[in-house]
Amino acid sequence: DYVIMPGDQGDLVYAIQFMLDVLSRKFSNIPSPGVTGTHNESSQASVSALQHAFALPENGQVNKATWDSLITAYRVHQ
């Protein structure tokens, strides 16, 4: 499994941040990550909040379980 780690950059990180930003407007417990394309501290905090909401380990990294939860939430709430 591929994991998005702190400092990673690129289109996939941008997409993750975009989806988290959309969710942050609907759920006050998910902070906006800012959409920069770099998995920085604010992005990690947003991922950790999503992980908490889905009862996943809160590490701020995006693995398959976190990705699947993000996609599910985004599809339901976009």
Per-region residue spans from a language model:
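Cell-envelope/ECM-targeting effectors and their regulatory/trafficking segments
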Residues: 1-78
